[in-house]
A protein has these predicted regions:
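All-alpha helical catalytic cores of prenyl diphosphate-utilizing isoprenoid enzymes
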Residues: 1-207, 272-275, 282, 286
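Short helix/loop segments within enzyme catalytic domains
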Residues: 117-118, 244-247, 254
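Acidic carboxylate-rich catalytic motifs and surrounding loops in phosphoryl-/glycosyl-chemistry enzymes
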Residues: 124, 250-257
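Hydrophobic transmembrane alpha-helix bundles
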Residues: 150-163, 214-223, 241-248, 281-301
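Hydrophobic alpha-helix feature that most strongly marks membrane-spanning transmembrane helices
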Residues: 169, 173, 192-195, 201, ...
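C-terminal, helix-dominated tail/subdomain
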Residues: 211-237, 256-266
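Acidic, carboxylate-rich catalytic segments that either coordinate divalent cations
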Residues: 261-317
Length: 317
């Protein structure tokens, strides 16, 4: 029988983590001089990478349940006077307790046992906890028409890819390499752009489900008319940093990474398809992820969700 503090993952979490693991192997192994097309390169490190990502997905699912429960019950996680049914309240309380009481402790213990835990990995896991806290705070604020700070929004979007950084740091530890800070810096900028791209692709769904989404946050902060231009400015600044960092990479590595981005685009990966050229004065994006398109913003999210619910009800009848 497993101990209470033993890290364990479910099959569903492993299945959900699959696409992230594939993307990580295809996009990050090259930074370690490894060929993802050679099975021995993948399977040597896959158990630790798969277990870690699956555990993170498992915790992320619990956090999503809290956010979605807040949406469906029109309640705020931290400060709600509304009463839930007794059984539901107990379950909700347990989920909150798990996320508030060092959710990564079992994983940390497991990695320590394997001799893989470093202070840098521990720090990234703490960033993951911080992201989930910010996600709950910001989504609750949107739902309850409360003010949000743009500093919190930008902090959250930069923390969001913490799992990729954890996996990358684990790979450094397993291969015995010294962490390459130049590569980490380049990848952090690329991760930011991919997260923004994902948010633009998932915008309408994130409004419906009350998920963290940078465009939603910009609409609340700057208003529906100004949000697209402000986000376009943010993307342009990140693209400029990306281009400068790309020039610092080894030419062969730079070529391989850009080729990987092109492959992902052809495969229809939503992370690699976006565009804000109309908001950049007609400028074509220089980022290898392609050009950008910001979807029409939803000024009144509550009305949007209500109308969608009415439409689905009419379809049923």
């Amino acid at each position: 029988m497993p101990c209470a503090d033993m890290a364990a993952v479910g099959l569903d979490s492993m299945q959900r983590a699959n696409s992230t693991l594939e993307d990580f192997c295809r996009s990050y192994f090259m930074f370690h001089g490894m060929d993802v097309n050679k099975p021995q390169s993948v399977f040597k490190f896959l158990p630790v990478l798969a277990f870690t990502e699956s555990y993170i997905y498992q915790m992320d699912t619990l956090n999503e349940k809290i956010v979605h429960m807040s949406t469906s019950n029109d309640m705020v996680m931290e400060n709600s006077d509304r009463e839930l049914p007794e059984g539901e309240e107990r379950w909700f309380g347990k989920v909150v307790d798990v996320l508030k009481s060092d959710p990564f402790n079992p994983l940390v213990r497991q990695l320590e046992t394997c001799g893989l835990m470093t202070e840098r990995i521990r720090k990234e896991l703490k960033f993951g906890e911080e992201y989930w806290t910010l996600e709950r705070k910001l989504c609750s604020a949107l739902l309850n028409q409360k003010q949000i700070l743009i500093e919190d929004v930008m902090r959250a979007i930069h923390l969001k890819s913490f799992d990729y950084r954890v996996l990358n740091l684990l790979l450094y530890e397993m291969t015995g390499e010294k962490v390459n800070d130049l590569h980490m810096e380049f990848l952090s900028i690329s991760e930011f752009l991919v997260e923004v791209s994902d948010d633009l692709f998932d915008y309408e769904d994130d409004v419906i489900e009350n998920n963290f989404n940078i465009l939603r946050m910009f609409v609340r902060t700057y208003g529906a008319s100004e949000a697209p231009a402000m986000l376009a400015k943010c993307i342009a600044e990140a693209e400029e940093k990306y281009a400068k960092q790309l020039e610092l990479l080894d030419s062969d590595l730079s070529f391989k990474y850009q080729k990987r981005c092109e492959e992902a685009t052809k495969e229809g990966n939503p992370s690699i398809v976006s565009s804000v050229s109309q908001n950049l004065g007609g400028k074509v994006s220089g980022h290898s992820l392609g050009s950008w398109t910001i979807p029409p913003v939803i000024a009144d999210e509550e009305l949007y969700r209500r109308n969608l619910k009415k439409s689905s009800t009419r379809v049923l009848f």
